[in-house]
Regions:
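Nucleic-acid endonuclease domains
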Residues: 1-37, 42-146
């Protein structure tokens, strides 16, 4: 309909830029959270959001994730439906606290390079605040933030 191929998917940096514009934030320099005040995750609607921690920086990354709020962007396969949710760090901290001993144990094995966990779409909907919703290509909801 709009003249673009839907082969492949929108990259993570594109979702980070979209989110930065939406919440008036900036990219964070170096490793850690994606934006100064937010970690950005994206998935198709109904799917879980993956958190991945690499061996060399995993512990620092998990600590950084505890210190920021989290934005979750979901989309349909056609990109005609998009939801953006904000989950405050206080609601995420118990999850990260649960993952911490698992992360440490994971890296006791010398061959382990990554530690992956996920947050469910249901958790995001139950604990989050909806910031934006596009349905059928039409803006249906936008929460003005100050």
């Amino acid at each position: 309909q709009y003249g673009f191929s839907l082969q492949g998917s929108v990259g993570s940096k594109d979702w980070e830029v979209f989110t930065a514009i939406l919440v008036n934030d900036r990219a964070r320099r170096g490793d850690g959270a994606d934006l100064v005040n937010y970690e950005v995750k994206f998935a198709t609607i109904g799917s879980s959001f993956e958190y991945q921690y690499h061996r060399n920086r995993g512990l620092n990354k998990l600590t950084d994730d505890r210190d920021v709020d989290h934005i979750f962007v979901t989309r349909s396969e056609t990109y005609m439906n998009v939801e953006v949710w904000l989950v405050e760090r206080t609601k995420m901290i118990p999850i990260f606290d649960r993952w911490l001993p698992e992360l440490i144990q994971n890296y006791e094995a010398a061959d382990r390079q990554r530690f992956r966990r996920s947050v469910t779409y249901g958790f995001v909907r139950n604990q989050g605040v909806r910031l934006l919703e596009i349905t059928g290509g039409e803006l249906r909801y936008f929460l003005e933030t100050t």
